[in-house]
Regions:
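Autoinhibitory N-terminal propeptides
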Residues: 1-9
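Subtilisin-like serine protease catalytic core
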Residues: 11-168
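Aromatic/hydrophobic pocket-lining residues that form the small-molecule binding cavity
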Residues: 171
Length: 175
């Protein structure tokens, strides 16, 4: 929501929308298939990504479901079931940092930082040909999801929490 993020005001004052910048999010992973990140935005796309442990950029089934200009890479240090608070101290790392079905906190954080936004019709805000610097708060008021502060930035996602929780034990590995 732009009223909270003030992205439009930032773009107006600085002229910067994240172009040429990459941001790393160390959290629960990223749903890179979401329309907010230029992905297909469908349940089927998400399930396909969720069922893979391969690098999403090289997995032929998954790579076509994401925007390679937005998603630059990442790694899953935790695995879906890792949660030391619940007695599972054994991470099961893999190359796919997809945000699991347990909460999507990492996806939310990434959206606030650098999501494209999602228009009222469900399409990615990346499809707006006017460019972010020309948008006003009124333009994006009807969107389902407002753009993040740096919508033209790329993302690296590092999953350090399991799908249902965890501790900060794996953060240093991701850094």
């Amino acid at each position: 929501n732009d009223q909270l993020v003030n992205a439009v005001k930032t773009w107006e004052q600085t002229g910067k929308t994240g172009k040429g910048v990459n941001i790393a999010v160390v959290d629960t992973g990223l749903d890179y298939t979401h329309a907010d990140f230029g992905g297909a935005g469908t349940t089927e796309a998400y399930q396909t990504a969720l069922n893979s442990t391969a690098d999403p950029l090289t997995d032929p089934k998954v790579s076509k479901l994401l925007d390679k200009t937005k998603f630059k890479g990442g790694y899953d240090y935790a695995g879906a079931t890792y949660n030391p608070n619940a007695g599972n101290n054994n991470p099961t790392p893999d190359a796919n940092p997809i945000d699991g079905q347990g909460g999507h906190h990492g996806t939310h954080v990434a959206g606030t930082a650098l999501g494209y936004g999602v228009k009222a019709d469900g399409t990615s805000g990346k499809t707006d040909t006017a460019g972010y610097q020309k948008l006003t708060a009124g333009d994006i008021a009807s969107w389902k999801i407002g753009p993040g502060a740096a919508p033209e930035a790329g993302i690296y996602s590092y999953k350090v929490f399991g799908d249902n929780g965890g501790t900060t034990d794996l953060v240093l590995e991701a850094l």
